[in-house]
From Swiss-Prot:
Controls reversibly actin polymerization and depolymerization in a pH-sensitive manner. It has the ability to bind G- and F-actin in a 1:1 ratio of cofilin to actin. Binding to F-actin is regulated by tropomyosin. It is the major component of intranuclear and cytoplasmic actin rods. Required for accumulation of actin at the cell division site via depolymerizing actin at the cell ends. In association with myosin II has a role in the assembly of the contractile ring via severing actin filaments. Involved in the maintenance of the contractile ring once formed. InterPro entries: ADF-H, ADF-H/Gelsolin-like_dom_sf, ADF/Cofilin. One of its GO terms (molecular function) is actin filament binding. The keyword Cell cycle applies. This is Cofilin. The keyword Nucleus applies. Residues 5-137 form the ADF-H domain. One of its GO terms (biological process) is endocytosis. Belongs to the actin-binding proteins ADF family. Keywords: Actin-binding, Cell cycle, Cell division, Cytoplasm, Cytoskeleton, Nucleus. GO terms for cellular component: actin cortical patch; actin cytoskeleton; cytoplasm; nuclear matrix. PANTHER family: COFILIN-RELATED.
Length: 143
């Protein structure tokens, strides 16, 4: 339960574990239910194109997401995969929505074991592939 009184629905944990352990999904989008009491799964996808993920982020509302982010490391290290947690809170979202999402984030984040990076996005430049790549690849060899 978060400071805002919002709980994490079991389906959210199940979807996350399906992404993390079962590699069933490439990304999962989470949001609040209609009465803003629970964090639920809004959508799951196995689409590998990062741009498809970005298109799912609303221009005028908040959401959370986890993405199985794959990238290459130069040299012999090859491909890496890291699970990234996104808090999407665009400047154009309603203030009330931003407040509830901000105060509920920790409950979801603590429930998702195995996330390696957190990205806070208020505009698309902050969640662009290159921006995320720079953050997740720090300390993982040169890129």
């Amino acid at each position: 339960m978060s400071r805002s009184g919002v709980a994490v629905a079991d389906e959210s944990l199940t979807a996350f574990n399906d992404l993390k352990l079962g590699k069933k999904y490439k990304f999962v989008l989470f949001g609040l239910n209609a009465d803003k009491t629970s964090i639920i799964v809004k959508e799951t996808s196995n689409e590998r194109d990062y741009d498809v993920f970005l298109e799912k982020l609303p221009e005028d509302d908040c959401l959370y997401a986890v993405y199985d982010f794959e990238y290459e490391i130069s040299g012999a290290e090859g491909k890496r995969s890291k699970i990234v947690f996104f808090t999407w809170s665009p400047d154009t979202a309603p203030i009330r929505s931003k407040m509830v999402y901000a105060s509920s984030k920790d409950a979801l984040r603590r429930a998702l074991n195995g996330v390696s990076s957190d990205i806070q996005g208020t505009d698309f430049s902050e969640v662009a592939y290159e921006s995320v790549l720079e953050k997740v690849s720090r300390g993982a060899g040169s890129h």
